[in-house]
Amino acid sequence: MSRRSGSLPPRISIPTVVGSVRLVQEEELLKTPGMKLENCRVVLVRPAGAANVGAVARAMKNMGLHQLVLVQPRFRNRFWVRAMAVHAGDVVARMRVVDNLADAVADAGLVVGTTSRAGLYRTPLGSARELAPRLVAAAQSNVVALVFGPEDHGLSNEDIKWCHQLLTIPASPEYPSLNLAQAAMVVCYELFLAAQAQPQSELGPRWAPARDVEFLFQRLRDAFLRIGYLHPQNPDHILFAFRRILGRAGLEERDVKILLGLARQIEWYGDGGWRILQEKQREAGVTAAPEKR
């Protein structure tokens, strides 16, 4: 019958081979025991909205993350946290509140900040999708802290210094800014997919906790200032480069001890140890290399 008579056209059966393959792959992916996300921690720095925090908690629960830490939240009433979390009440119940970012990431072997702003100290290592596999692998033997900044202006440079690596979320240049819950959901989703795609394997290296790495950077800062390597008016300019270099490499506890020894030796040399060294060289008959002109 024609469509003019009010009848529907005959249904045409088109095999959705591509869709079927994709669905089967996703089902098999979820059945495969993947890597664990229990060591992944979401850190919200100075969040302004209780509802946003609740939405982040829900996104975390959807994707299998359970550690949530707030740094100096700018709200008191937690009603909307619980309301927006819906069935993620257990995440909210275990949520910690701390006074500073240092306390939130002190035990983390890897601290990853999220940024949408470009700048000298804000060059991301990659997108959330690109970094997710290595973050999941690191989380098998380390606490991995994922740091999100305030809703209004993101992470400050002081916050960024605690981050070993930075990631970004690509978005349309027409409106590239995501709200807090959206950003958290995207990152958690990429971690979830990466975890499911990677079968459980042997544990990787255990990295030094962030508090020890930060202590190292402070010692290096003092040592470099002692020998005039850093500009006294802006010492953190060059030090940020060291943070990025060593952050990309990943430092084990043994590495931190070696670099602390280097910092102590630099301080000793800058405090007059060079004179003792010169005297020993003269006694040993070693001639110092001539200065370059």
Where are these regions (language model features)?
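Post-transcriptional modification and biogenesis factors for structured RNAs
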Residues: 3, 7-293
